[in-house]
Design a protein with these regions (language model features):
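Conserved active-site motif detector
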Residues: 1-218
Length: 218
């Protein structure tokens, strides 16, 4: 079983807004890469200001060919002086640092200039590990001392969630602190989730906690 074979393109209006899964980048069995929009999600996102990815303007078309190369432009350039710190933060396997599909998955293709991100639909295989940022923090307004780097967290499937049937809540002891991101949360519904371990990787705080990055591993 592969670690993943699909990356979902997420977009949101801004911090605190709901994520829309507007497309999927798939590694097909013949080795090619295909990008397709989800028209239903695109329509909903458009009401919040979404515009198609510049290089892929037609939301009714499936794109192949150079799609991975284009999306790969979101990956940090290896010539940057801080690239090693970047690899260390995201815990990149050196064997895959030239693999654009892997790099988009494990760094989520995040850029400060837009609100797109790539979210992998991971499979539960031994040795899996990736970082994800907790969702929903704007609703919790956690004080700076609510959590610390290295804390081991626990999770629960949120069966009562009326907005997302795949929702997964995260706790520090008995304190609810956030949710697993869309798409990443699918892993927690698959067989073998009892082996998953959640550990706090990094925290951004200023008066309240703004971001929590956690490491998911098994």
């Amino acid at each position: 079983m592969k670690e993943f074979d699909k990356l979902y393109l997420s977009w949101r209006k801004g911090k605190g807004s709901r994520r829309h899964i507007v497309g999927v980048l798939e590694h097909t069995p013949n080795g090619s890469f295909v990008f397709t929009y989800d028209n239903s999600s695109v329509e909903k996102a458009a009401t919040e200001g979404f515009a198609p990815y510049t290089e892929f303007p037609d939301v009714l078309k499936s794109y192949n060919g150079q799609v991975l190369e284009i999306f790969g432009q979101r990956i940090i350039k290896s010539a940057r002086p801080d690239v090693q710190q970047f690899y260390e933060f995201w815990e990149i396997d050196p064997a895959f640092k030239e693999d654009k599909f892997y790099m988009l998955a494990h760094t989520q293709g995040l850029l400060p200039t837009d609100n797109f991100e790539f979210l992998a639909d991971y499979n539960p295989i031994i040795g899996l590990h990736f970082l994800t940022e907790l969702a929903g923090l704007t609703n919790y307004k956690l004080p700076p001392d609510a959590i610390k780097t290295g804390d081991v967290l626990r999770f629960e499937i949120d069966k009562e969630n009326e907005f997302d049937p795949e929702a997964v809540k995260v706790f520090n002891s008995d304190k609810e602190i956030g949710y697993i991101k869309k798409i990443h949360c699918r892993l927690f519904h698959k067989p073998g989730t009892e082996l998953l371990k959640l550990t706090v990787k990094a925290i951004d705080k200023n008066g309240i906690i703004n971001k929590i990055f956690i490491k998911v591993s098994m």
